């Protein structure tokens, strides 16, 4: 019996540059796991970005050591996770008035093929599910595809 080798098919989905916004919440882990699955064993690179939102009453270039320390810790966690899964990683911190606009701008600047965002389970007043401000903004305004992965939760969405 002769066994022939099957011709290797090209991957259906390939990404070279994935932007992963890091918020420092449990939702980051969901986005990091998905990014590791997509980039493991490839030459692709993950760009982790933490955005420090600066209120309008402060200067945009104002220093906030506490926020920078939090960002460093969150980015360090993400970098360690992806490095452990053999994914190339680059990290960055941005200061902006709104995280959504900073994420969209960074994706354009880095020529991201994909944005992978973690999403926390949140309920707004009245019991409905709420995606917040950042995720909907990025989904509406990004030129790159946006994938959201909601973090696991014990809470169920029961709406009347």
Residue map of PLM features:
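Short glycine-rich, flexible loops that bind phosphorylated cofactors or substrates
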Residues: 27, 99, 123-125
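Active-site phosphate/pyrophosphate- and oxyanion-stabilizing loops and adjacent acidic/basic residues
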Residues: 33-36, 104, 136-137
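Glycine-rich, Arg-bearing micro-motifs that act as flexible, cationic patches
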Residues: 117-141, 155-158
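General small-molecule cofactor/ligand-binding pocket signal
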Residues: 47-49, 90-94, 147
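Structural beta-alpha unit
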Residues: 1-13, 83-115, 120, 153-160
């Amino acid at each position: 019996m002769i066994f022939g080798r099957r011709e290797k098919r090209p991957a259906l989905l390939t990404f070279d540059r994935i932007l992963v916004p890091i918020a420092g919440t449990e939702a980051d882990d969901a986005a990091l796991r998905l990014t590791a699955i997509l980039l493991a064993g490839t030459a692709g690179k993950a760009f982790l970005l933490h955005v420090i939102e600066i209120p309008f009453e402060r200067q945009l270039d104002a220093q906030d050591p506490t926020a920078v320390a939090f960002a460093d810790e969150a980015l360090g966690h993400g970098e360690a996770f992806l490095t452990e899964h053999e994914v190339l990683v680059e990290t960055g911190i941005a200061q902006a008035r709104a995280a959504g606009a900073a994420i969209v701008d960074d994706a354009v600047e880095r020529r991201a093929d994909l944005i992978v965002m973690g999403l926390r389970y949140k309920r707004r007043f009245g019991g409905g599910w709420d995606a917040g401000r950042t995720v909907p903004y990025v989904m509406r305004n990004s030129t790159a595809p946006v994938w959201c992965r909601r973090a696991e939760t014990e809470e169920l969405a029961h709406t009347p």
